[in-house]
């Protein structure tokens, strides 16, 4: 009886291991394809995400912005920063998340402006 139970457990772990390996390979392939599709800006953006510890999508969700417009980002940042101020009963943790999100979006806008400048220069010459 114990022998069969051990065999069932080993086979179950093998199945889970294979599924995990397959899922991991698919995730790596999807990540690589997405980075290649976005080109150089995608590589820079991924590097910034890994350095800042926050993804672009997460930063957009925190500040509740869909498009990267400086006015909307600044408006939402100021509102969320004031609302989460510790002196008015807010959370320092949430306030720091808001700051990190704004920093990440600012970095992304810098990357986009750098990639747009060479395109503008090539069209003018």
From Swiss-Prot:
The keyword Mitochondrion applies. It is found in: Mitochondrion inner membrane. Residues 58-110 are annotated as: J-like. GO terms for biological process: protein import into mitochondrial matrix. Keywords: Membrane, Mitochondrion, Mitochondrion inner membrane, Protein transport, Translocation, Transport. Probable component of the PAM complex at least composed of a mitochondrial HSP70 protein, GRPE, TIMM44, TIMM16/PAM16 and TIMM14. Associates with the TIM23 complex. This is Mitochondrial import inner membrane translocase subunit tim16. The gene is pam16.
């Amino acid at each position: 009886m114990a022998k069969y139970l051990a065999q069932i457990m080993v086979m179950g772990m093998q199945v889970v291991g294979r599924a995990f390996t397959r899922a991991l390979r698919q995730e790596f392939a999807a990540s690589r394809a997405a980075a290649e599709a976005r080109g150089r800006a995608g590589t820079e953006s991924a590097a910034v995400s890994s350095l800042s510890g926050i993804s672009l999508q997460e930063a957009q969700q925190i500040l509740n912005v869909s498009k990267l417009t400086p006015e909307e980002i600044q408006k939402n940042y100021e509102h969320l920063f004031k609302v989460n101020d510790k002196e008015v009963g807010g959370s320092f943790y949430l306030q720091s998340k808001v700051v990190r999100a704004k920093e990440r979006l600012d970095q992304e806008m810098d990357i986009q402006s750098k990639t747009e400048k060479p395109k503008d220069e090539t069209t003018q010459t």
